[in-house]
């Protein structure tokens, strides 16, 4: 094959990346994401593998951030188990499912509780034990907006 390629006799050579999915798949399983999303998705009876759709979109956002449409195109250059038959509208449905508001809004903060919150709570419960200690909290501040007087030299 290599000799034919060097001679210019190979009609088509295609490559697909294996690394991103291979590395992240193990983390996905070890953290319990696969099981938690699979359990929650099983309650809804989707006609496609919702867990694989969520995995694909998360993997895409980690390695090449973009829209769900971009994720659908991006996946063709990778080897990812279980995503070959997924269609764009199924990726949209998977993301919509994560944003579905829950009927039980107890413990609600500033925003309505969604399926995403259930996933986070169940993942935390898997790792939480008698000896767990919450010593570090990460906050996503990418969408925060501050307004006020002063602070003109803060970013310099």
Which residue ranges define each predicted feature?
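Dynamic "connector" segments at or just before major functional cores
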Residues: 1-155
